[in-house]
């Protein structure tokens, strides 16, 4: 079985799924890749994800190699595809909430101090899977990232017939005025909350401890 599974391990993997188990202040996160969407959506693949997540919870992050062997010996041959662990992680916090999208391929975990509303944290995790923020707040965005975005915007404006004739100095002033919007769009707390676009995530959560 393992020899045949080893042959399958040479094949490329493009699909997969993930599973998150939460228990008190800890989240156990695993993702396993496979070759086809058909298998990724099957009940047997989803059942395997449950087993691997439980194995992580029982044995800790250091058991990743053992978990991969478990998959190869018990599932790869039966499923007929190359199955590879892509994520095998434990997250600890005071309050942990997780959301896994219905397709089993998108998920987010929110971790906060004691006192936060777990239901709200789960809704924010749902927001993260939809809005894909890159930072928690604008303060975390480096000047290097901002400068790179400015150059991207500058090139776009130069290629715009209505703006391209203006001097770079003028264009950069216009771009500087747009950086606040850019920072807000990529920062979780400043994003419009997907369940109520009229409020920002930070306002939905209340005080940001």
Regions found by a protein language model. Give the residues of each.
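N-terminal assembly/interaction segments in proteins that build large macromolecular machines
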Residues: 1-209
């Amino acid at each position: 079985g393992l020899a045949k599974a080893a042959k399958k391990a040479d094949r490329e993997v493009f699909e997969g799924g993930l599973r998150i188990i939460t228990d008190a202040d800890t989240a156990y996160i695993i993702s396993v890749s496979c070759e086809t969407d058909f298998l990724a959506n099957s009940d047997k693949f989803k059942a395997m994800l449950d087993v691997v997540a439980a194995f992580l919870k029982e044995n800790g992050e250091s058991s990743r190699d053992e978990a991969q062997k478990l998959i190869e010996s018990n599932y790869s041959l039966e499923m007929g595809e190359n199955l590879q662990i892509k994520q095998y992680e434990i997250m600890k916090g005071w309050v942990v909430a997780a959301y896994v999208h219905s397709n089993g391929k998108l998920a987010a975990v929110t971790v906060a101090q004691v006192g936060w509303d777990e239901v709200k944290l789960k809704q924010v995790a749902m927001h993260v899977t939809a809005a894909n923020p890159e930072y928690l707040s604008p303060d975390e965005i480096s000047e290097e990232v901002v400068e790179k975005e400015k150059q991207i915007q500058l090139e776009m404006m130069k290629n715009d017939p209505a703006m391209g004739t203006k001097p770079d100095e003028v264009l950069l002033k216009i771009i500087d005025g747009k950086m606040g919007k850019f920072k807000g769009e990529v920062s979780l707390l400043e994003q419009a909350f997907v369940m109520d676009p009229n409020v920002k995530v930070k306002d939905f959560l209340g005080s940001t401890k």
